[in-house]
Amino acid sequence: MMGEDPKRWLMDHAPKKGIDALAPAISISAAARITGLSDSALRKYESAGLIIFHRTAGNVRMLCVEDLERIELIQCLIKKRGLNLEGILRLWALLPCWEFKRCRPESRERCPAMHDSERPCWVLLSGEKGCEGQLCRTCEVYRFGAYCTEDLKVLLRSLPGATKAED
């Protein structure tokens, strides 16, 4: 059960605690070999907004352990749940990032994610510094929100002000 604090729930469900899961260490070609996908499929995930790769100073894509786990999750959503890339984006767009981050009301009104149900916040803020000065790829909503796909209804019911389901 998630409990009362959705942000804490997301952090508790973070993948592989105890290692630096954000350290870019894997080239896109190595990631393709590990995942069994092609380089072009991984680039397609990036261009669709499903994943934010690290970029070196020379603009070379690099992945971290968390990126590999995210790719595995995307593959699971495609193969086991029958979603396509657009379906995954729309599902992730339902995550109320403003609740997880406890955004101030004035920030919420300016936030494009508050008014768009088709793209997750990190896609809407692409090319920007993210929200509240935090880079999207380091934000807990981007990093861990995707993992709550199975528990989305429970997650949404646990948010402050949400209507509780009747037993």
How should these model regions be labeled?
Residues 2-28, 33-34, 52-58, 65-167:
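Arg/Lys-rich, alpha-helical DNA-contact motif
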Residues 31, 35-39, 44, 63:
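Functionally constrained cores in energy, signaling, and assembly domains
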Residues 39-58:
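Major-groove DNA-recognition helix of helix-turn-helix-type DNA-binding domains
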